[in-house]
């Protein structure tokens, strides 16, 4: 079970998520990264990846983590929402 940022980063590496989906890093923000009670895990994806891969990534994460996962693509994010996310984002890196 993933309970904090460090265990989430270890999970991503173990599952080879970065290589499987062509990502160099994944931003984690929101209540999960702040260590508060969380209902879902909010992720910021900076690279452009095909829509089907994005769906596959979300489905895999939700199945494995047993939590809803919200993915925000930086390129398409509303500026106000992105600015808020960037205030507490932590990056899990390959």
Task: Identify the residue ranges that each predicted region occupies.
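Catalytic core of pol beta-like nucleotidyltransferases
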Residues: 1-27, 33-38, 46-94
């Amino acid at each position: 079970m993933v309970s904090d940022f460090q265990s989430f980063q270890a999970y991503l590496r173990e599952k080879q998520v970065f290589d499987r989906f062509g990502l160099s890093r994944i931003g984690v923000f929101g209540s999960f990264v702040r260590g508060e009670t969380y209902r879902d895990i909010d992720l910021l994806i900076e690279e452009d990846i095909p829509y089907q891969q994005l769906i596959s990534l979300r489905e895999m994460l939700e199945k494995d983590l047993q939590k809803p996962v919200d993915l925000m693509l930086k390129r398409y994010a509303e500026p106000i929402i992105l600015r808020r996310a960037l205030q507490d984002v932590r990056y899990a890196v390959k």
